[in-house]
């Protein structure tokens, strides 16, 4: 670069695969080496400028990845699609960048709607296979796969997964949507393949530990529904070992869903997003909701619409018992009666 001439800043997206055995997870920390730290140091050396990557999924210590996503900004003139090849020559052999390409400056891997897919592998036989020991959980007790599938079915859909997460210091919304949860048996290998809108801290590992309990006969399959209802970590099974877990992929939505529906025993709602792009407007119909869940549902779904680009969100509670109070703060949002639509309340970003 010529002195005094500033190159154009560009944002580069990476698809990162790694064997997490020797790393203390993704995120930089004091007590050990991490994937993020190695990427930052290697990119800084390659591009001759300070680099700090932003990762989509902050996997835990010992967890593997086939397709985590990261981005960084650089002024270096190296073509974005060539960075992966140069980077892989410098990275340790247990980390590889599968793809690098330029993306728009406002692209953020954590703020885009995406479907995350994980796999949890269980070797179910009397004697452990040495070649699988770093990438699977070993269980010598015979597991009933059909019962595991029955138990897994209760977890599909939108639920409060508070029972299936390890508590952390900060308060966290615990409602998530699981789109699919398959229990696949191939010889002695059982694979749990799970896709969802996002996952709580240790959620997949606790689901794996719970379904193994079901497979052992310690819990009947229907007990999984009782665990969900308890909303208490102590109700669920143990947290399975990190080494069996692999982040498989992150699939980002290219188009905004026109309509989102959520339904379970506790609530049912429809979020209409078809006017967000044209008019900055979304509508939320709450068909039914338990009183104790109402405020959380309201805040969470309105926030989702705002995150997706809505400037105004109109809400109607079809049970109509005065649960939306004009002027009262609901998280970051305050509602007023919508002058143009009787029975609707509106909040603005």
Please identify what each model-predicted range represents.
Residues 295-303:
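A short, charged, amphipathic alpha-helix used as a generic interaction element across diverse proteins
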Residues 278-289:
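N-terminal acidic leader/helix
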Residues 269-278:
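Short beta-strand/loop segment at the start of cytosolic alpha/beta domains
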Residues 186-188, 280-282, 342:
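Beta-strand-connecting loop/turn residues
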Residues 302-338:
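Acidic, low-complexity, intrinsically disordered interaction modules
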Residues 2-268:
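Structured-RNA-binding interfaces characteristic of tRNA pseudouridine synthases
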Residues 334-349:
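C-terminal edge-of-domain segments
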